[in-house]
Swiss-Prot record:
Interaction with SAMHD1 stimulates the double-strand-specific 3'-5' exonuclease activity. RBBP8/CtIP specifically promotes the endonuclease activity to clear protein-DNA adducts and generate clean double-strand break ends. DYNLL1-binding inhibits the activity of MRE11. MRE11 activity is inhibited by C1QBP: in absence of DNA damage, C1QBP interacts with unphosphorylated MRE11, preventing formation and activity of the MRN complex. The modification Phosphoserine is found at residues 2, 275, 618, 640, 648, 674, 676, 686, 699. Component of the MRN complex composed of two heterodimers RAD50 and MRE11 associated with a single NBN. The MRN complexes dimerize on DNA to form joined MRN-MRN oligomers required for DNA double-strand break repair. As part of the MRN complex, interacts with MCM9; the interaction recruits the complex to DNA repair sites. Component of the BASC complex, at least composed of BRCA1, MSH2, MSH6, MLH1, ATM, BLM, RAD50, MRE11 and NBN. Found in a complex with TERF2. Interacts with DCLRE1C/Artemis and DCLRE1B/Apollo. Interacts with ATF2. Interacts with EXD2. Interacts with MRNIP. There is a cross-link at residues 384, 468 (Glycyl lysine isopeptide (Lys-Gly) (interchain with G-Cter in SUMO)). The modification Asymmetric dimethylarginine is found at residues 570, 572, 574, 576-577, 580, 587, 592, 594. The gene is Mre11. InterPro entries: Calcineurin-like_PHP_ApaH, Metallo-depent_PP-like, Mre11, Mre11_capping_dom, Mre11_DNA-bd, Mre11_N. Residues 505-706 are annotated as: Disordered. Mn(2+) 2 binds at residues 60, 128, 217, 245. Belongs to the MRE11/RAD32 family. It comes from Rattus norvegicus. There is a cross-link at residue 282 (Glycyl lysine isopeptide (Lys-Gly) (interchain with G-Cter in UFM1)). This is Double-strand break repair protein MRE11. It is an enzyme of class 3 (hydrolase).
Length: 706
């Protein structure tokens, strides 16, 4: 369909769907720094050219939890450029906006704000990269929401129970129920689904007349026993699921035969990991919804940097490489050079006729050197391609896989055998490393009071969210809780008995996962509150508080400049913003200037010594210490619908058949037809070959639901 197709009438929703844009990814890289912004510009331009009703984002709009000023500025600039204007919004919102956007200071959709002139509304959930953090649980999307550019929905305020209330939209006779669930740690959400703590609310009136669209940002592929969300967990009244977080582009809706809904995985719009899933061509989707029918048109992204990957197993070429040959390294280098040149030639051929595509491609050659071979110097080899590829430092990746006990003669499956580094998008997580360490550590270094899970969560907060006080607050909180337990039990002050009671108390907490979750949340909230207090205290200093003798400062700078070379190329004498004689710590760190005479320091030597002493106290010492800190406290579907997948930009239209014609034919043999099942009536039209299209089958049974 073209943007001016007559079937795009007042009853048809046109929605641009995208996920995982990752604005700011590698923004400091000289070659790839602007890739995310250029592609985001293309996505918004596609929305404008296709005259969509709104844009739907599936999380991870930003790559960093705390995006830089450049990233925020570029994002706001593009949203203002494309999403503001005089074009009227053709649909209305009929749900309670105070429920949909209740966590915002402006609990209404942005295009209904009289102070804003929005032409293309943007609805977005948050992902795991830009999720809410801090004492106030804010994220970068909340900044965009407050500015009036994004409608942030799908946010859960509770960690015990999730009630998903839909945003109800109507355009003409078409009713769209938009459900969203921002990123939640997979293990926690998995447990909530198992315990029936996730509820998707439905409209009270005429619930079967709504097209139900659900946006989620979780692991779809299985990374562990509970580190993913099975599609079977989702309610079966859903019609289409937009699945974010997974970067491989599988935007064509696929049918879940158990729940009988469709899943579309748009994938990322930028290559963030040099892994096989990222080699798939990137697309966004133009979703049309009319009544109970839908059509998904794939729109290729033409500004995405090319990415080519190839695997080489040296042992598979015995005629070319002999490990005992002293010149085998030179032969391997020549072979790798030839492979990379082939990929560069392929990139050049594909780039012809597309001036929007970046000139330098991403190239990755993975070399398995098992069998007695030795890797060569990758950095020296990569210097040949500095001016030709966008990733010269990691063009080649050497690896070895462990020898298998039994040879099956099958081809090597790199996805199963390769131990990928973190740079290739593996799911290596901090809390898993902590758990693995304590599982393999010797007995004398095992935790006796703290829990592995709590420590893992605290370290993850420290690494991912830069919560510098997370570990310290967790230790203090669990120590306080243990002390209270021992006091309540009136344990004798015998070291052996106290150690035994502490061990039992720790084991009981480990068995009670809910209690341990509460401990971690309380400790993290205390760490965030402490950081917020430190930030407020740092920002409370005025120019009068930090004033000093300009003459002394100038003399001091003059002396320093004669005796030492500055280590940073920053200007001197910055006034109230701080020169070399000042140092401000925005997060509560040390604020000691050099020769300023202010004596402002939040953590002097004495405090460090005290902290070190308290950390080294044993359990018995802590218990005996007299100084105590205060404690801190489903309906049956009887409708039919039509779903189409458009693989090209050619004109196509919604089927004009009657309601009876939209139902599946019952002539094709099927084992399930004898079970009195009714068809959901989902039909696909595609430009691909019918033999390869799983949606063009003559019959698709549907069972009756209770």
């Amino acid at each position: 369909m073209s943007p001016t197709d007559p079937l795009d009438d007042e009853d048809t929703f046109k929605i641009l769907v995208a996920t995982d844009i990752h604005l700011g990814f590698m923004e400091k890289d000289a070659v790839r720094g602007n890739d995310t912004f250029v592609t985001f510009d293309e996505i918004l331009r596609l929305a404008l050219e296709n005259e969509v009703d709104f844009i739907l984002l599936g999380g991870d709009l930003f790559h960093e939890n705390k995006p830089s000023r450049k990233t925020l500025h570029s994002c706001l600039e593009l949203l203002r450029k494309y999403c503001m204007g005089d074009r009227p919004v053709q649909f209305e919102i009929i749900s309670d906006q105070s429920v949909n956007f209740g966590f915002s200071k402006f609990p209404w959709v942005n295009y209904r704000d009289g102070n804003l002139n929005i032409s293309i509304p943007v609805f977005s959930i948050h992902g795991n990269h830009d999720d809410p953090t801090g004492a106030d649980a804010l994220c970068a999307l909340d900044v965009l929401s407050c500015a009036g550019f994004v409608n942030h929905f799908g946010r859960s305020m509770s960690v015990e129970k999730v009630d998903i209330s839909p945003v109800l939209l109507q355009k003409g006779s078409t009713k769209l129920a938009l459900y969203g669930l921002g990123s939640i740690p997979d293990e926690r959400l998995y447990r909530m689904f198992v315990n029936k703590k996730v509820t998707m609310l439905r409209p009270k009136e005429d619930e079967n007349s709504w097209f139900n669209l659900f946006v989620i940002h979780q692991n779809r592929s299985k990374h562990g026993s509970t580190n993913f969300i099975p599609e079977q967990f989702l309610d079966d009244f859903i019609d289409l699921v937009i699945w974010g977080h997974e970067h491989e582009c599988k935007i064509g809706p696929t049918r879940n035969e158990q729940q009988l809904f469709y899943v579309s995985q748009p994938g990322s719009s930028v290559v963030t990991a040099l892994s096989p899933g990222e080699t798939v061509k990137k697309h966004v989707g133009l979703l049309r919804v009319k009544g109970r029918k839908m059509n998904m048109q794939k729109l290729p992204l033409r500004t995405v940097r090319q990415f080519f990957m190839e695997d080489v197993v040296l042992a598979n070429h015995p005629s070319l490489f002999n490990p005992d040959n002293p010149k085998v390294t030179q032969a391997i280098q020549s072979f790798c050079l030839e492979k990379i040149e082939e990929m560069l030639d392929s990139a050049e051929r594909e780039r012809l006729g597309n001036p929007q595509q970046p000139e330098k491609p991403l190239i990755r050659l993975r070399v398995d050197y098992s069998g007695g071979f030795e890797p060569f110097n990758v950095l020296r080899f990569s210097q040949k391609f500095v001016d030709r590829v966008a990733n010269p430092k990691d063009v080649i990746h050497f690896f070895r896989h462990r020898e298998q006990k039994g040879k099956t003669g099958e081809e090597i499956n790199f996805g199963k055998l390769i131990i990928k580094p973190a740079s290739e998008g593996t799911t290596l997580r901090v809390e898993d490393l902590v758990k693995q360490y304590f599982q393999t550590a010797e007995k004398n270094v095992q935790l006796s009071l703290l829990t592995e899970r709590g420590m893992g969560e605290a370290v993850q907060e420290f690494v991912d969210k830069e919560e510098k006080d997370a570990i310290e607050e967790l230790v203090k909180y669990q120590l306080e809780k243990t002390q209270r337990f021992l006091k309540e039990r009136h344990i004798d002050a015998l070291e052996d008995k106290i150690d035994e009671e502490v061990r039992r108390f720790r084991e009981s907490r480990q068995r009670n996962t809910n209690e341990e979750d509460d401990e971690v949340r309380e400790a993290m909230s205390r760490a965030r509150a402490l950081r917020s207090q430190s930030e407020n205290a740092a920002s409370a200093f005025s120019a009068d508080d930090l004033s000093f003798d300009i003459t002394e400062q100038t003399a001091d700078d003059s002396d320093d400049s004669q005796s030492a070379v500055p280590s940073r190329g920053r200007g001197r004498g910055r006034g109230r913003r701080g020169g070399r004689g000042q140092s401000t710590a925005p997060r509560g760190g040390s604020q000691r200037g050099r020769d300023t005479g202010l004596g402002i320091s939040t953590r002097g030597r004495s405090s460090k010594a005290t902290a070190s002493t308290s950390r080294n106290m044993s359990i018995i010492d802590a218990f005996r210490s007299t100084r105590q800190q205060p404690s801190r406290n489903v309906a049956t579907k009887n409708y039919s619908e039509t779903i189409e997948v458009d693989e090209s930009d050619d004109d196509d239209s919604f089927p004009t058949s009657s309601r009876a014609d939209q139902r599946w034919s019952g002539t094709a043999p099927s084992k399930r037809m004898s079970q009195s099942q009714t068809a959901k009536g989902v039909d696909f039209e595609s430009d691909e070959d019918d033999d390869d299209d799983p949606f063009m089958s003559g019959s698709c049974p549907r069972r009756n639901r209770r």
